[in-house]
Amino acid sequence: FAFDGSANNPYLPEHIMAEDVVYTGTHDNDTSLGWYQSLTVEQQQIVLNYLIAHDWKQEGDTCQMPEDLMRLALASSAFLAIIPMQDLLRLDGHHRMNVPGTVEGNWQWKFDWSQVNEQYCRDLQTQLQQYGRLH
């Protein structure tokens, strides 16, 4: 919801307050990677421009989804950051949980331990430590 190109968008990371809950997705929307892949080139550029303008990326870098959104969520001042399992596993839209208003194909995705990548676990632990989210 945040990356529509408006600097006044209330969902941008800099507008998140300490008492807020931030999340990269819910059961009712696409995975972060699926969302990003569905954007037009122009919309993807808006996301990248935001990341560059806020020193998350350098000129010439590319977006790394869902990693970039996960870092923004974890680095936010929100009390709670929620990352769906599909984002933690870097899964695309084929792993979406639910499409509201449809009756077929929903709630089919199941987590499997074989999907866990050791590097993803190390990256997550590093970010949780870096952003003070290990308690």
Give a label for each model feature.
Residues 1-135:
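Catalytic cores of glycan-processing enzymes that make or break glycosidic bonds
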